Every structure is written in C-alpha cells, then in structure tokens.
C-alpha cells in the first residue's frame, strides 16, 4: 500500500502566525486557495482506495478541488472519510495564541527537544497524537500492496507518521519539515515502510505512483525507477 500524506494548504492562521489548533472557522488564505488548485493538478488522476481527511475545515478545503474535479468525476459514488483520529493536535489553552508569544514559554523547549514528554495544558500530549494517527496508518497498511490511500491532515500529525515510518523516535520529529500543501508518499508494501517522497510542493504525484514498483529487497541502494 502506498500512502499519500497531504498537509492542508496555507491558512488564515498561518498568515497571522497563530497556533489555531482545533479552533473552528479557520479557513484557507488566498495563498492557500491557490495552493489547493495547484495541488489538484499535481495529484493528477490515480485510483484512490481511501481518502481520509481531518475534521478541520482547512483540510477539506485543501482537497476539495481534487476531490471534485478528478476523483468524483471518475467515481461519482466515492465517499471521503472525515476521520477525527487525524485531527490537529489539541493544543488546549495554547490554541489561538501567537507563536511568537508561545515561544517564550518555558514549555517551548520541551516541545522542541523532548516532544514525547509534552502535554499541552487542557489539551493532549504529542505522544497521544502520534498514537491515534498511527492507528489509522496501521489500518490502511492492511490494504493490498497495489492500493493507494490518501490522508489530508496537519503538520505535526504528518511529521509523527513520517517519524514512525523511518524508525525515528518522536523526540526527533522536529527534524522533519512538512510545509503547507506539501505531499509526502510512504510505501508500506515491503518488510518496513519506505519514504518515496517527502515535503514536496512541486512533483507530479501521478508520475511517482504510476512508476514501476521498487524491489522489496534492497541492497546497494537499488536501481532507481
């Protein structure tokens, strides 16, 4: 199974430097709306076994152009799944605050250096977030090797999934960058997950998904596509 991970496009809160978390009515910015249209073109046309989307408006707005212009035209009865397990981190009382102000809190160092130990006041822990996100991935990984699933979620959620895929401890997940409207692709068809694409904002994803399957048994770096 190949898993396409998409972070929502640039949002109104991104533009303001605000940690929106799960606050309602946070929509895409004008920049984000343009990104969502370009994303639809980049994704192109490929069969989707499942499309799972965070409940936050900005995530559905990000994928809507592709869903409406490509997926539903080919499969009119296809239904995306709004999955609360892929929701943004519950940042609790940090939600709605300026990142510049939050960076001055003593807990900020924990977020950056030991995120597995961070539990947001009146919210959830980063480790809890990873656990719920990975429960979705483990379910999708049961799909046949030939299938492709798509997740539309948030930066920290996707970073935690990528960290797990490459066997990196959660405390190191801040080393991973996931930009708005970026696409990452993981392959779960082998013994261990593999990263095919990471934080990409330019590639034509269809070309990657339609490329010949890579060998499950690699030694010496493999022969490429």
Locations of regions flagged by a protein language model:
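Short, hydrophobic/glycine-enriched beta-strand segments
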Residues: 2-8, 151
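Short basic (Lys/Arg) and small-residue
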Residues: 154
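Acidic, low-complexity terminal tails and accessory targeting/binding regions
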Residues: 2, 89-100, 142-147, 164-225
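Loop-to-helix element that buttresses phosphate recognition and phosphoryl-transfer chemistry
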Residues: 10-61, 65-66, 119-134
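Phosphate-coordination/substrate-recognition cap region in phosphate-metabolizing enzymes
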Residues: 37-109
